[in-house]
């Protein structure tokens, strides 16, 4: 087999066919690694592992060359990386295994050859992670369309306009049980083709752009660079790579690196799913694309009836501690009370580490030893992304905060006619699924908006939340702009100047579409719109120009999305990062309206008053307050809120 792969690689090189060369190089690496595993002579086995790793390096070098400059016009970088992700995983696994063998029996951080292998494996993992986001962040500061033929730019705009038109139709149709399924299927097919065409046009623009030719895109960081550029003496990185046979955890501080072997992907994913199913009541669970965690997709339920109580606490504690023991406990002695920067993988992307219980037992939510009680926790798509957004962040002056809340969802809401009276039905959770309509607490459908077919109830808690935060802002000497009712509109968000706000806070219903992440978004006023349909979708957020160091999305499931191999979770977080927000606050599931208002008010009080906490520290303190307060001590209420990106 090795001779065949060698001949195939030589032939591909001679014919200048890198697309055929990397599979041959990978085949050579796999064959040599398999041979080494069967070799009884330790010296020959070590030589076999080295030749296998060298072949993996060759394969990755070929893949990176294809990705950086010679992709076909009909192939997007993210799609290409997804198809080659296994090569990165196998190469990283080989190096990690060799590092662990070399370090066997040693205590403390890795040194010597073991550290060298672990560092190379880490960089390969970073190479395979969130690369499209890194590229987009690199391109965002450069006008790569300058000098590009006008016809090409027009094709791009026409394509985007049609995608937007179809998105508006499908968003409304997916919420309407009477929609024409055949018509929707045709539109879905057209949208798929438009998306493929758009990737082709983007690649043609890059090829035709003089600016792009001279643009140096951000490169994934080495382990030493992460220690120097990303971490501080109070922060530890936990980076996970889940593999078919084994998974790996890099625990990194400024002073050292440790590597741990974990169970394979399926085992870790199952533990994460088990915990998530304990965290989220059955009727509020969502099926996340690619990860089967759900039974149903009901929204707007009465939280008093659906939320967990202490009768479920023991089962939660068991599931939570089991996952903690698998993915955090191996590194616990290195962490102390450091801030944790978590770069997750697989189903770990859908579990808040704050909710992990560090010791088994217990049947009282308010008395459990949660990880959040000892550590601040922040998340990132990759360690390299943190470095890039940190370099690009421009801090606005002043203390301005923008608050967007309590939109008008229904045409017969009195506010739509200028009245101030509240509608009859309020929702208790902030979010909606694409498969079902919202009902009020009593189970009676809320008023319907004919244009969209959407049944959606008002969230009065978001108004209270925004007004309280505005008071806190003004009391601390800052300025708060607050958009309520019809002012909480898509047009205002898209057309007003948002660059001078230090915080942008949006409290409304979230719209999750895990199958098509570009349709995931925020629901703003659905009536009185002269432009737009009231849904601020992911693809529209990419076009915003933000200067706010913090964007807080106080809505349902804003941290969810589709996990694409090599990219992580694709959804609202990366859209807001691209738009200029280095830190994004999102939620992991459908959040309760009243408890969310309380948590957010407490969070801002700690940020804006004399305590002057960072957003990460304030969130942790607010969560601890909820745990101690007993009324909302179940993690269902406080754990879904996470911060992604910069923590400083």
Residue ranges, per PLM feature:
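Amphipathic alpha-helical protein-protein interaction segments
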Residues: 6, 33, 37-374, 379, ...
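Short coil/turn linkers that connect adjacent helices within long alpha-helical scaffolds
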Residues: 11-19, 65-66, 78
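Functional beta-strand-loop-alpha-helix junction segments that form "active/interaction loops"
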Residues: 214-225, 305-326, 449-519, 524-544, ...
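Loop/turn elements at helix/coil->beta-strand transitions in domains of secreted/extracellular proteins
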Residues: 336-339, 398-399, 476-478, 499-503, ...
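Cysteine-dependent hydrolase recognition
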Residues: 383, 389-510, 556, 581
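An often Trp-containing, charged/polar helix-loop segment at the C-terminal end
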Residues: 391-395, 400, 595-648
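Catalytic cores of nucleophile-dependent amide-cleaving enzymes
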Residues: 502-602, 606
């Amino acid at each position: 087999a090795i001779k065949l792969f060698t001949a195939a690689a030589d032939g591909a090189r001679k014919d200048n066919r890198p697309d055929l060369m990397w599979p041959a190089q990978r085949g050579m690496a796999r064959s040599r690694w398999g041979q080494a595993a069967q070799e009884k002579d330790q010296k020959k086995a070590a030589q076999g592992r080295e030749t296998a790793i060298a072949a993996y390096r060759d394969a990755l070098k070929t893949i990176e060359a294809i990705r950086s400059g010679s992709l076909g016009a009909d192939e997007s970088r993210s799609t290409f990386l997804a198809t080659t992700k296994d090569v990165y995983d196998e190469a990283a696994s080989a190096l990690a295994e060799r590092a662990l063998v070399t370090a066997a029996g040693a205590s403390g951080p890795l040194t010597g050859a073991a550290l060298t292998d672990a560092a190379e494996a880490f960089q390969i993992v970073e190479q395979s992670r969130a690369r499209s986001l890194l590229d987009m962040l690199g391109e965002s500061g450069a006008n790569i369309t300058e000098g590009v033929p006008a016809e090409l730019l027009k094709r791009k705009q026409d394509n985007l306009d049609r995608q937007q038109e179809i998105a508006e139709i499908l968003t409304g149709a997916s919420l309407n049980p009477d929609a024409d399924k055949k018509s929707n299927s045709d539109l879905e097919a057209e949208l798929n083709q438009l998306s493929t065409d758009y990737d082709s046009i983007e690649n043609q623009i890059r090829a035709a752009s003089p600016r792009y030719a001279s643009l140096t895109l951000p490169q994934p960081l080495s382990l030493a660079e992460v220690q120097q550029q990303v971490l501080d003496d109070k922060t530890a990185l936990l980076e996970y790579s889940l593999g078919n046979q084994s998974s790996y955890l890099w625990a990194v501080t400024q002073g050292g690196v440790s590597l741990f072997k974990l169970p394979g992907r399926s085992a870790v994913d199952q533990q994460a799913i088990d915990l998530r199913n304990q965290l989220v009541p059955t009727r509020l669970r969502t099926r996340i694309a690619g990860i089967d965690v759900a039974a149903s997709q009901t929204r707007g339920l009465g939280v008093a009836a659906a939320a967990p109580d202490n009768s479920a606490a023991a089962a939660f504690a068991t599931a939570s501690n089991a996952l903690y023991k698998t993915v955090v406990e191996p590194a616990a002695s290195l962490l102390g009370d450091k801030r944790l920067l978590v770069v997750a993988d697989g189903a770990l992307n859908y579990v808040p580490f704050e909710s992990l219980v560090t010791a088994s037992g217990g049947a009282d939510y308010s008395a459990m030893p949660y990880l959040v009680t000892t550590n601040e926790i922040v998340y990132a798509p990759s360690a390299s992304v943190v470095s890039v957004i940190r370099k690009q962040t421009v801090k606005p002056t002043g203390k301005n905060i923008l608050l967007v809340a309590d939109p008008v969802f229904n045409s017969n809401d009195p506010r739509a006619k200028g009245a101030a009276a509240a509608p009859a039905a309020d929702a208790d959770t902030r979010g909606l699924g694409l498969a079902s309509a919202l009902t009020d607490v009593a189970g009676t459908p809320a008023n319907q908006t004919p244009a969209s077919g959407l049944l959606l109830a008002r969230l009065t808690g978001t108004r209270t939340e925004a007004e309280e935060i505005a008071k806190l802002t003004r009391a601390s000497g800052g300025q708060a702009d607050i958009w309520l009712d019809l002012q909480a509109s898509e047009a205002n968000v898209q057309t007003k100047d948002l660059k001078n706000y230090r915080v942008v806070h949006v409290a409304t219903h979230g719209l999750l579409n895990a199958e098509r992440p570009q349709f995931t978004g925020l629901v703003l006023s659905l009536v009185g719109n002269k432009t737009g349909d009231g849904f601020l979708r992911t693809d529209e957020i990419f076009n915003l120009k933000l200067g706010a160091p913090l964007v807080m999305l106080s809505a349902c499931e804003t941290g969810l999305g589709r996990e694409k191999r090599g990219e992580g979770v694709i959804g609202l977080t990366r859209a807001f990062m691209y738009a200029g927000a280095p830190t994004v606050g999102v939620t992991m599931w459908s959040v309760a309206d009243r408890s969310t208002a309380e948590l957010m008010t407490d969070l801002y009080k700690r940020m804006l008053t004399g305590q002057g906490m960072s957003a990460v520290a304030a969130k942790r303190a607010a969560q601890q307050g909820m745990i101690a307060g007993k009324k909302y001590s179940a993690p269902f209420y406080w754990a879904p809120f996470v911060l992604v990106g910069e923590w400083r």
